[in-house]
């Protein structure tokens, strides 16, 4: 197959305005193609979210490609140079919402699977795709419920490639072999409202909160490790008061977030925060939300297979990185021992005029195919 096979499929996918959680039959299109080459396809739907689990083969190892058909809203359409849902070729690029994040990755892997099966119809092991329409949104009815279903059924995943756009300057320069965890807190500090002229009759929660926050911001939570930078603490929102200048507020609210490595646990971070707040004598309520645990795939079979495929196709030695935000890899890592993320350049994701280089489509497909060969056909 030629690069046009990937391009044609990408265009079909971009033309479907699949803003979270609407799939707009993207997965039906994928399933139809996969069924023609022997995949057993299953839809797992909940809460308006569509998920596709497609598997070919019953043996081990099971190599999975994970991705999402949903896209973020395009924003003001008059800011785009062309309709975000009309795939447009211009100046060596393909424009459209989802071009980089991540419909090109999905199309490239589907065509890679078609090529691989055509040459190796009786290949060892199994190939599967896990596709959701709920990655860019709440992510509560998407990949996480498919992983729960697979766990209950006893389907053992061995390797997973998540098609997130990880490349930065050139296709193949960066892979993500892990991601930091995300832990958020909503801190409500209680005071006593009153008149600013009579502070002795009030208790200002802002004045009480400020030194505690100053201490939290200055803490070195850990030093990171070989794969992760140190854990970070960031205050994202502060709110207090009625809007009047003569009223001491009765409460103050701070929202904050940790991006943490495997060098710290959520329990350790929570305990240290509570220790600081208690020591400052605050009357408070603190609600926690764990967005995801960190995961890490050390160098091994999967990283070697992908890195060697990238080098064979592009000549680049890919960097293994754990930077960036969370992804669905955090759910898959619970049931799969080796997870890695790899896809096209990410410079325009979520932006107006999102695009991908046309010349990168064939190499992306070839890298995925070579990775399958390295994992399933190795002696």
From Swiss-Prot:
Entry keyword set: Amino-acid biosynthesis, Cobalt, Diaminopimelate biosynthesis, Hydrolase, Lysine biosynthesis, Metal-binding, Zinc
Catalytic function, reaction form: N-succinyl-(2S,6S)-2,6-diaminopimelate + H2O = (2S,6S)-2,6-diaminopimelate + succinate
Needed co-factor(s): Zn(2+); Co(2+)
Entry binding sites for Zn(2+) 2: 101, 136, 350
Cofactor: record remark: Binds 2 Zn(2+) or Co(2+) ions per subunit.
SUPFAM superfamilies: Bacterial exopeptidase dimerisation domain (SSF55031), Zn-dependent exopeptidases (SSF53187)
Pathways per UniProt: Amino-acid biosynthesis; L-lysine biosynthesis via DAP pathway; LL-2,6-diaminopimelate from (S)-tetrahydrodipicolinate (succinylase route): step 3/3
Catalytic activity, EC: 3.5.1.18
Binding site for Zn(2+) 1: 68, 101, 164
Summary of the function given for this chain in its UniProt record: Catalyzes the hydrolysis of N-succinyl-L,L-diaminopimelic acid (SDAP), forming succinate and LL-2,6-diaminopimelate (DAP), an intermediate involved in the bacterial biosynthesis of lysine and meso-diaminopimelic acid, an essential component of bacterial cell walls.
Family affiliation: Belongs to the peptidase M20A family. DapE subfamily.
PANTHER family: ACETYLORNITHINE DEACETYLASE (PTHR43808), N-ACETYL-L-CITRULLINE DEACETYLASE (PTHR43808:SF31)
Subunit structure: Homodimer.
Descriptive protein name: Succinyl-diaminopimelate desuccinylase
Source organism of the structure: Bordetella pertussis (strain Tohama I / ATCC BAA-589 / NCTC 13251)
Species classification: Bacteria, Pseudomonadati, Pseudomonadota, Betaproteobacteria, Burkholderiales
């Amino acid at each position: 197959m030629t690069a046009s096979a990937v391009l044609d499929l990408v265009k079909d996918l971009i033309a479907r305005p699949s803003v979270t959680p609407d799939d707009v039959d993207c997965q039906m299109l994928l399933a139809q193609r996969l069924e023609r080459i022997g995949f057993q396809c299953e839809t797992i739907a909940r809460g308006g979210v569509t998920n596709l689990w497609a598997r070919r083969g019953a043996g081990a190892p099971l190599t999975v490609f994970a991705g999402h058909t949903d896209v973020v809203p395009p924003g003001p359409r008059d800011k785009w140079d062309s309709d975000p849902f009309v795939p447009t070729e211009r100046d060596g690029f393909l424009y459209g919402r989802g071009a980089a994040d991540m419909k090109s990755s999905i199309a490239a892997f589907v065509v890679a699977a078609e090529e691989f099966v055509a040459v190796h119809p009786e290949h060892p092991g199994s190939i599967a795709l896990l596709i959701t329409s709920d990655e860019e949104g709440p992510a509560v009815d998407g990949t996480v419920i498919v992983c729960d279903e697979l766990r209950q059924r006893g389907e053992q995943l061995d390797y997973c490639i998540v098609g997130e756009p990880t490349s930065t300057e050139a296709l193949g320069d960066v892979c993500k072999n892990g991601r930091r965890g995300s832990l958020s807190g909503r801190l409500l500090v209680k005071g006593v409202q009153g008149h600013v002229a009579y502070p002795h009759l009030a208790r200002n929660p802002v004045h009480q909160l400020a030194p505690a926050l100053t201490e939290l911001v200055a803490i070195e939570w850990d030093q990171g490790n070989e794969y992760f930078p140190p854990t970070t603490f960031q205050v994202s929102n502060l709110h207090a008061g009625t809007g009047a200048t003569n009223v001491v507020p009765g409460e103050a609210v701070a929202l904050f977030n940790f991006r943490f490595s495997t060098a710290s646990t959520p329990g350790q971070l929570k305990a240290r925060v509570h220790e600081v707040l208690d020591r400052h004598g605050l009357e408070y309520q603190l609600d926690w939300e764990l967005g995801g645990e960190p995961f890490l795939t050390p160098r091994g079979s999967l990283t070697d297979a992908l890195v060697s495929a990238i080098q064979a196709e592009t000549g680049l030695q890919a960097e293994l990185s754990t930077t960036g935000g969370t992804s669905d890899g955090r759910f898959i890592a619970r049931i799969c021992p080796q997870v890695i993320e790899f896809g096209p350049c990410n410079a325009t994701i979520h932006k107006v005029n999102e695009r991908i280089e046309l010349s990168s489509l064939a190499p992306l497909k070839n890298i995925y195919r070579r990775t399958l060969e390295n994992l399933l056909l190795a002696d």
